[in-house]
C-alpha cells in the first residue's frame, strides 16, 4: 500500500510538472529546453499512470480510487492527442492545457480519497497534540537583546517578516515586466515601511488577544499576556509603528502603496483578529487576504498601479495560506481549543483538515502555474514549483500515514520552504535570466 501511495503521489506531481512545462513550451516556442523537458516528462507520466492504474486494481480496496486512477489513465492519452494536433496545426493550446489541469485535479482528488480511507495509521500513539513551549516568534538572536527591547521586538512578530518581505520584493520584481525600473530607494523604503506595518499589525494582535493568549501554552508568555508590556504602551507602540510606516511609504514610495499597506494592517488586525478568528472556521481562508497583499503592494510601489501578475501572485499566497496554516492548527489544536478559537481541526477534526490541506495545495499549484503563464516564466520557475511542491505534498502524505502532530509541524515548515523557493524563483526569472 505504501508503494501505491508513493506512486500516485509521484504521478500527481509529475502531471503538475508536465502542465507548467507545457506552459513554458507554449511561451518559448520551437524546440527549446522547456519543450524537450515537456516531451520527456509526458512519456514518464504515461508510464507512471499505467503503473498506478495496474497497482490500483490489484491492491486498492476503494472502488472510487480504482476508477479515479483509471479515468486519469484514459483521459491522459486523449489530452496528449489534442496536444499533438495542436503541435501539428500550430493552433492555440488552451484545450490541451485544460486537459492536463483536469488530469492533475483528478489525480489529486484520487490521492486524497486513497489517503483518507486506505492508508493505515502507523503512529496513533503520537496523535496527541504537539505542544511546544513559547510563541514561536523568538530565536537565539532575539534572546541576546536586552529584556526591555526584546519584549517590544516580540510584539512585532519578527518571524513573519522575512517571508512577507520576500513576497513584497517578488511583487516589485514582477512589476518590471511592465517596463518599470527598480531603484534602491523604492526597494528599501517599501521593505522598511512594510516591516513597520507588519510590526504594527502584530502588536495590535497581541493587545486584542491577550486574554485568550493566557489560556494557551504556545502564547502564554507573550509580552502583553504576561503584563511585561502594558496594554497602553503596546497600543502606543503599534500606533507609532503604523504612523512611521505610512510616512515612509507616502513620502518615499507612493500613496497607492501606502493605502494598500494600511488596508493590509486593518485586514489582519481587525478583519482577521477581531471578526474572523474567534467566530468562524473560515478564519484562515478569508484571513489569508492579509498575507497576500504584500505582493500587490510591491507591484504598486514600482508600477504605481495594480496588475494581473501581482493579483495572481497574491492569489497563490491566498490559496497557500490554508495549506500552510492548517498544519500548525493541527499540531496545536488542543491549545486553540483552550483559547476557544474555532479552528478547523478543533471543529471538524484532523482528517477533514488534512483533506483541505491537499485541496488547497492543489489550488496553490494550479494558480502558481497560471502565474507562470501570464508572467512568461521558464523552466527554473516550473521546476522549482514542482520539485519543492513535491516535498510539501510528501510531508502531508506522511501525516496521513503517521497521524503524528510532529509531522504536521514538519508540513508547516515545508510549506514555508515551498513559498520561499517559489518567490526566489520569481526573482531569478525576472532579475537574472
Curated annotation (Swiss-Prot):
Disulfide bonds: none annotated. The chain crosses the membrane at residues 4-24, 35-55, 67-87, 95-115, 160-180, 184-204, 236-256, 257-277, 282-304, 308-330, 357-377, 378-398, 413-433. Residues 165-430 are annotated as: Protoheme IX prenyltransferase. It is a multi-pass membrane protein. It is an enzyme of class 2 (transferase). GO terms for biological process: heme O biosynthetic process. One of its GO terms (molecular function) is protoheme IX farnesyltransferase activity. It holds the Pfam family UbiA. GO terms for cellular component: plasma membrane. It is found in: Cell membrane. It catalyses: heme b + (2E,6E)-farnesyl diphosphate + H2O = Fe(II)-heme o + diphosphate. Residues 1-164 are annotated as: Unknown. Pathway: Porphyrin-containing compound metabolism; heme O biosynthesis; heme O from protoheme: step 1/1. Keywords: Cell membrane, Heme biosynthesis, Membrane, Transferase, Transmembrane, Transmembrane helix. It comes from the Archaea. Its EC number is 2.5.1.141. In the C-terminal section; belongs to the UbiA prenyltransferase family. Protoheme IX farnesyltransferase subfamily. Converts heme B (protoheme IX) to heme O by substitution of the vinyl group on carbon 2 of heme B porphyrin ring with a hydroxyethyl farnesyl side group. Carbon 2 of the heme B porphyrin ring is defined according to the Fischer nomenclature. This is Protoheme IX farnesyltransferase 2. It comes from Natronomonas pharaonis (strain ATCC 35678 / DSM 2160 / CIP 103997 / JCM 8858 / NBRC 14720 / NCIMB 2260 / Gabara) (Halobacterium pharaonis). The gene is ctaB2.
